[in-house]
Amino acid sequence: MRKATIHYLANLNQKQYLKTMKRKLCVMSAIVAAALFATDASAQTVLFKSDTVSTCYRIPALTKAKDGSIFAFTDFRPCRTDVGGGVIDVVAKRSTDNGRTWSKEQTVVKGGGDNVPFDVAHGDAAVVTDRKTGEMLMMCASGNVWYWQSTLENPNRVGRYYSKDGFNWKGEEITDQIYKLMNGAVHKLFFSSGRICQSAKIKAGKYNRIYSALCTNVGNVVLYSDDFGHNWTPLGGADARPAKFGDEAKIEELPNGDVLLCSRSQRGAGRIFNIFKYSNAKRAEGKWQTAANLDPIYKSAMCNGEVLIVNAVRKADGKKTNVLLYSVPMDAKRNYVGIYYKELASTADYASPELLTKGWKTFRLSNTDSAYSTMEQMNDGNIAFFYEETHQKGGYDMVFCSLPLDKITNGEYVAGKVKK
């Protein structure tokens, strides 16, 4: 073979080698970038930063818009205390990329109307987005009366707000409408902050049914609405008391369409579960079961949390199933927020509230003082988790993170089809 030919082939082989290596490096770079991106997505992000001087935030709430974007709401509390103690606004941020980046903070419901008692403060937001229209509903604790000092003559007030875009809200006071539902038995109440539940199965009018739990002086009262919050009705009737010693509570729809109540206890640490079993879902007929208390081996502080059921796939055998999540500080005091989880493979797993008091597994998220939390599943399958951490003289840092289901469940389950 002539030297020129050998030289040509050597150059050709070198070019091919360099081209191949370049392709491999590109692939490796993409893999590394994806890994870093995923790490960033699940990392903790302080969305609202409190301090001990002038900035005070509390109370997390989330909703997923129809386009999949996530809205995070919280109280901005110049008064550094609850509704009744001074001016409080509801503020928000939005993420369009599953929690990786966020918009600037924006006030969405403003307090400070000293001449109008209802408008002094608005907080403890409970929110939901209608899955069909994209309209958003927010229920607020409002006014200038402390919850503990509320009377029928001078009650703590209730605000209702609607929005089409998550940032511009219009609302009104509906205090009388809500108090009258319990026929005079309730003289103090508020909608539990966080996530209002919308049914995926029951539609008795234009909208799918929604549920929210009241914290009252007679324990929990669960309300439902078939017209997206314009009118509310006590589930089980005006005298129904699904958790007589319940405090702040959350609602979730069970896989068969029945209604799960998960409540903070007024009597100390722990959790109360109850289930409303429908006999006729469309007419909202049925009965609450006997409330059951969480086994005390599962530490749960006196604190608001969240409850959520997601479609899942069991990694051990690839079978579709459901996983129930509930979040709470995993301590006697407000420390170590985490998520308890358990599988609901069939109706037999939630045939009674008693069955929900045991069999939980744990995922601890926070390693310090932490309190209220809420969660929502995003369109990428991850759980949007928003919670209070690091107490700051009446406020907390409001922290967001995106959690894959397999991380929460220690590798046992992955997310199934995301509920729309």
Say what each PLM segment does:
Residues 1-44:
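Bacterial Sec-dependent N-terminal signal peptides
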Residues 42-420:
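Asp-box/BNR beta-propeller blade signature and adjacent active/binding-site loops
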